[in-house]
Amino acid sequence: MAINFEELHPQEQAELERNIFFTTLEQIKGWARSNSLWPMTFGLACCAIEMMGVGSSHYDLDRFGSFFRTSPRQSDVMIVSGTVTKKMAPIVRRLYDQMPEPKWVIAMGSCATAGGPYVNSYAVVKGVDQIVPVDVYIPGCPPNPAALIYGINKLKEKIRYEAKTGKQVTNK
């Protein structure tokens, strides 16, 4: 059913222009997904201490619509913080596979992004992106809670952009 706006009174036209917007269902889903991220914490080292700081009252990640979950089946974001060893790699992959679609990964800290100071060890994975596809990298050793909030906001921008354009930013 089409609405003929020319037949309306000028005041009604002005009211409609202020209160009606047109969008696609994909953009609405992208907006909803980006504003209700539920990260699963996977803290393996000192970066996990900084991740706990984000949940405290000083930074309060809840105000951005993100609530930490302990189950991968209830999460859509995995935050990997710390050194991933080769023995731990299959567990990280299994948890990632248990997450429902759509799912995203944030690599927090230099250990998760590239192996950190333990990069030359035989037992350390040289970045979590060798196990799971990473969407956002947060550098630092350890990155502060504000950097994690910035990374989560960048992930939100990425989700909205992909919903708006239909293009994937990274190759998963």
UniProtKB/Swiss-Prot annotation:
Catalysed transformations (reactions): a quinone + NADH + 5 H(+)(in) = a quinol + NAD(+) + 4 H(+)(out)
Protein localization: Cell membrane
Segments forming a coiled coil: none
Record's cofactor remark: Binds 1 [4Fe-4S] cluster.
A Gene Ontology BP annotation from the UniProt entry: aerobic respiration
Domain of life where this protein originates: Bacteria
Enzyme Commission number: 7.1.1.-
Known cofactor(s): [4Fe-4S] cluster
Bilayer topology term: Peripheral membrane protein
GO cellular component, one term: plasma membrane
InterPro entries recorded: NADH_UbQ_OxRdtase-like_20kDa (IPR006137), NADH_UQ_OxRdtase_20Kd_su (IPR006138)
GO molecular function list: 4 iron, 4 sulfur cluster binding; iron ion binding; NADH dehydrogenase (ubiquinone) activity; NADH:ubiquinone reductase (non-electrogenic) activity; quinone binding
HAMAP family: NDH1_NuoB
Name of the protein in its database record: NADH-quinone oxidoreductase subunit B
Native organism taxonomy: Bacteria, Bacillati, Bacillota, Bacilli, Bacillales
